[in-house]
Amino acid sequence: MSAPAVAAGPTAAGATAARPATTRVTILTGRRMTDLVLPAAVPMETYIDDTVAVLSEVLEDTPADVLGGFDFTAQGVWAFARPGSPPLKLDQSLDDAGVVDGSLLTLVSVSRTERYRPLVEDVIDAIAVLDESPEFDRTALNRFVGAAIPLLTAPVIGMAMRAWWETGRSLWWPLAIGILGIAVLVGSFVANRFYQSGHLAECLLVTTYLLIATAAALAVPLPRGVNSLGAPQVAGAATAVLFLTLMTRGGPRKRHELASFAVITAIAVIAAAAAFGYGYQDWVPAGGIAFGLFIVTNAAKLTVAVARIALPPIPVPGETVDNEELLDPVATPEATSEETPTWQAIIASVPASAVRLTERSKLAKQLLIGYVTSGTLILAAGAIAVVVRGHFFVHSLVVAGLITTVCGFRSRLYAERWCAWALLAATVAIPTGLTAKLIIWYPHYAWLLLSVYLTVALVALVVVGSMAHVRRVSPVVKRTLELIDGAMIAAIIPMLLWITGVYDTVRNIRF
């Protein structure tokens, strides 16, 4: 709605009878439009202040969100302007400025020294001016230098390993590389602690991983009769990564999701390397599936245990429990800019232990992402590797299909998108890897395998498209998915024992 008002001004002395003395315009202030009748032949500077005063009185009860931040008390000189255009000259009249009845104007506050001139001469220059891409400055140079350190370290490590191999595999090489890795780790700590450079500290930490893992791998002696690097060296490198991750705890920026991912993956690699080293390589795929299932199905429990989120004490009737007993208080908690004012007010109104609960909740979310992602990766790798030719070919294909279905079902149970993405990626990666593996084994049936693969992919896309308008899973459907998921997991374990020959071993036991 608009509030019409008339701002009277002195009449021009030489106005002719053919030209109207007033002009009806619409003034836009925020989202409110107000119709005004203004003098047409008088310079605008003679009545602009009166017009602003009238509008201020008319719109004084208008909500602030309707005005859109418009402030009648702004400093400067008021002027009229067409929307998106420079202000009109105050020494001109509305007729001189080409303002006619029905024109839309806005009020702007300008300085008396403001001058408006075109910034560009053509469209190409305008595009160049509007391009707000960041320039290459000192910060960009620092980022480049930080990222270049681990990238250049990788080929240097490769050359050092080649020299170590060609010069008799002396222990001085891994010792020197390990000392260099420790020095870089100290540099990462110094960069984060004293120079507050998180990017450089993270780049140095990545470099430390490369150096320490290489040193640990080269320090493991080759077995007798072996002339190449193998499972013992992989186990040594994975062990170094595991202990380094436990020591750094997510690095300078507390990336706990990456730390938890590295820990679980390193444990799986160590176990697989040990199995290969002692001749139990046939058990590695089944063991990977079992370990991956354990991590994926128990990720929430592991998260609560590692994050140390304790349940509040349950008092007996009549017993009072202090709020501070829920969690240990955190000294001098500092609010971050990411928190809303409402959340900050809530935190300020409760004991300091609530801040610790918030920190633990964030840590739990990061740990859950890492656990589910690593468990899914191990599960997918085991599902592809477990398929073997021979008597258990069909059995192993059934196990891989069940694992694919389990990953697809569980992707709908997680609200965290990274967890869902990891499970969906496994749902796609397992059939793709199996198809590639079968084509390598049976190249004459490649056309049939590819046709089946593309048909299944097309059906999956149709199913996903048909569920585009399903915003959430109902409790009944969710419970059904959980039951199907549990039944499939229960079917996977016996089939794994069957494939690995455990049943045959038990059957052949003689007392």
From Swiss-Prot:
GO terms for cellular component: peptidoglycan-based cell wall; plasma membrane. The modification N-acetylserine is found at residue 2. Its main location: membrane. It is a multi-pass membrane protein. The keyword Secreted does not apply. InterPro entries: T7SS_EccD (IPR006707), YukD-like (IPR024962). Disruption phenotype: Double espI-eccD1 mutants abolish EsxA and EsxB secretion, but not their expression. Disruption abolishes EsxA and EsxB secretion, but not their expression. Results in a lack of antigen specific immunogenicity and leads to attenuated virulence. Mutants exhibit defects in bacterial growth during the acute phase of C57BL/6 mouse infection, but survive for 140 days despite a wild-type bacterial load in the lungs at 100 days post-infection, suggesting the pathway is required for virulence. The chain crosses the membrane at residues 144-164, 171-191, 203-223, 228-248, 258-278, 286-306, 368-388, 389-409, 421-441, 445-465, 483-503. Residues 2-143, 192-202, 249-257, 307-367, 410-420, 466-482 are cytoplasmic. GO terms for biological process: biological process involved in interaction with host; symbiont-mediated evasion of host immune response. The keyword Transmembrane helix applies. Part of the ESX-1 specialized secretion system, which delivers several virulence factors to host cells during infection, including the key virulence factors EsxA (ESAT-6) and EsxB (CFP-10). NCBIfam families: T7SS_EccD. The structure in 4KV3 was determined for a fusion protein with E.coli maltose-binding protein. Belongs to the EccD/Snm4 family. Possibly a homodimer. Part of the ESX-1 / type VII secretion system (T7SS), which is composed of cytosolic and membrane components. The ESX-1 membrane complex is composed of EccB1, EccCa1, EccCb1, EccD1 and EccE1. This is ESX-1 secretion system protein EccD1. It comes from Mycobacterium tuberculosis (strain ATCC 25618 / H37Rv).
